[in-house]
């Protein structure tokens, strides 16, 4: 029988969710960020652990770049990104002297930081910890899953885009989840059509429906499609809360629906 982990800094975290993608450029960090914001607007207290060590973009998306990480008796204190302190964030981006500095580290150093992020960040009480992972399936993913395994993460959200290349990569991601014993909470298709900011009509730019079909064939839940939305893009670039500012947008409806589905699955996932 596997030994129980010391609860430590994750003792107050109720649910841990990983966000994965088979390839880069599909908007995985966007989904992580907006899911956290949507859960916050549902009254949940959320933390984001950014383990995308070579591409830490979430501090910029949440207008938190340049903020300092402080030490306490329990370890690192995450950065709060709102006045209510309902979203906290830890990222390697806070540890770099220059935000444009490239992270050129060998595997052992990356693995050590991932383990430190898991054990040494004083999250306090959280309803959800969203873990934004690098794209693909690599040693960093193995290190993340192994470090979190004793704390029984709920599972993974897998992000794809409609194109066939991305769908193929997601098949490999689903295989990774199966081999590592990580439950798939669901598949999210991002960049699914273009939402006009004036009339809200959604036009397919790429093929559509690939993510839903893949989820059906794999026997995992399909959580929804998020369109390309200029208002969402602008919010991320400016570090603004899209969920709060654009409640009438098509992407808002899609993102809040996904958050509702995740919340609805909680009883089954926890059983």
Swiss-Prot record:
Q: Indicate whether Transit peptide appears among the record's keywords.
A: no
Q: One GO biological process from the UniProt record? A: cell projection organization
Which terms does the record give in the GO molecular function aspect? 4 iron, 4 sulfur cluster binding; ATP binding; ATP-dependent FeS chaperone activity; iron-sulfur cluster binding; metal ion binding
Per UniProt, where does [4Fe-4S] cluster bind?
196, 199
Positions that bind ATP: 22-29
Q: What is its main location?
A: nucleus
List localization entries.
Nucleus; Cytoplasm, Cytoskeleton, Microtubule organizing center, Centrosome; Cytoplasm; Cytoplasm, Cytoskeleton, Cilium axoneme
Coiled-coil residue spans: none
Family indicated by similarity: Belongs to the Mrp/NBP35 ATP-binding proteins family. NUBP2/CFD1 subfamily.
Q: What is this protein called?
A: Cytosolic Fe-S cluster assembly factor NUBP2
Task: State the gene name recorded for this protein.
Answer: Nubp2
